[in-house]
Structure formats: structure tokens, C-alpha cells
């Protein structure tokens, strides 16, 4: 696909997935796209845990977001570690956001659907529980889990506002 076709095709898929495995090569390509994202001061604070099958995902189901993860044949958990960021403002939010968007676009390009799951993991107890299951060191923080797979149901898209409702030229409110 052309880049803008991928951007326009990406959406947040919140339904069930087909029970079709995601090949390792595709998971690796999606993860590489995330790791190639812009990151502040080259801190490279993002760490990914690839959950390559349902067996790897299963221990997370009782923690949070069961309805979004249960049918996913694969997922990627996005963590950040800011322990090496000492003398400058912490940009881990920007770093993991850029990595996550790159992975969503890469998944779309390969024909998969996904959704950015973060809300359920804002709860510190849930975050620590996921980290414990995945054996993640305490200096890392769970930011997002991306379930990945082929959609089993028709896509449901929310309409986007018109371009000129969200864009101004030179000064706020001015249009071309």
C-alpha cells in the first residue's frame, strides 16, 4: 500500500479476531517499525514484549481488557524505561506513542487489525500484575498492549471530522 492508503486504512478494531496465527516474520516486522520510531535524545527507552500466540496472552486475561485480548492470536506489550534519562525532560510518552503508531501502521500495511489498549493499564495494580507475569524489571512501565490479528467482524469506524474543522492556515480559524 502507499503510505497515505495505510494511514487512511488504519482504525481502532475493537471486535473479535479470526483464529489465524500471525507469522513470526510479521510480528518482527511490526516490532521493528516500532523500534524505528522517533525517540527523544536517542534514549531508546521503549522495550517491546511480543506475545506470539494465545498461550502467551492467556495469563493476562484475568488482569484487564479480557474482551479485547481474548480472541487475539498475538499481541505486543509496550514498556518504557526512563532510568537512563537523567539530565533532561522525560519524553517517554512521546517515545512510546510514536512507537505505537508506527506499529499500528505496520500492522495495517500487513493486513491486520489492532487497537491501542492503555486505559485498563493506567491502574498501577494492573500494570504491575502484567509486568510480573511477563517478568519485566521494576524500572519498566507498561504503557500499551496492541492485540494483533485478522478481523473476524466488519469494521466499525467512527467518522472523522472534516479537514477544515481541524486545520487552520497561518492563524487559528483561517482557511485556504
Where are these regions (language model features)?
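Acidic, surface-exposed loops and disordered segments
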Residues: 1-176
Amino acid at each position: 500500500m502507499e503510505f497515505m492508503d495505510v494511514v487512511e486504512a488504519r482504525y481502532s478494531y475493537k471486535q473479535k479476531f479470526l483464529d489465524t496465527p500471525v507469522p513470526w516474520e510479521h510480528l518482527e516486522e511490526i516490532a521493528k517499525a516500532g523500534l524505528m520510531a522517533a525517540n527523544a535524545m536517542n534514549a531508546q527507552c521503549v522495550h517491546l514484549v511480543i506475545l506470539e500466540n494465545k498461550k502467551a496472552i492467556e495469563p493476562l486475561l484475568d488482569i484487564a481488557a479480557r474482551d479485547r485480548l481474548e480472541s487475539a492470536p498475538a499481541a505486543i506489550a509496550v514498556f518504557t524505561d526512563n532510568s537512563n534519562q537523567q539530565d533532561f525532560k522525560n519524553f517517554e510518552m512521546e517515545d512510546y506513542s510514536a512507537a505505537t503508531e508506527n506499529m499500528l501502521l505496520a500492522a495495517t500495511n500487513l493486513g491486520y487489525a489492532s487497537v491501542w489498549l492503555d486505559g485498563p493499564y493506567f491502574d498501577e495494580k494492573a500494570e504491575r500484575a502484567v509486568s510480573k507475569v511477563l517478568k519485566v524489571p521494576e524500572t519498566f512501565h507498561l504503557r500499551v498492549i496492541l492485540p494483533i490479528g485478522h478481523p473476524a467482524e466488519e469494521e466499525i469506524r467512527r467518522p472523522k471530522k472534516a479537514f477544515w474543522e481541524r486545520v487552520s492556515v497561518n492563524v487559528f480559524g483561517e482557511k485556504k
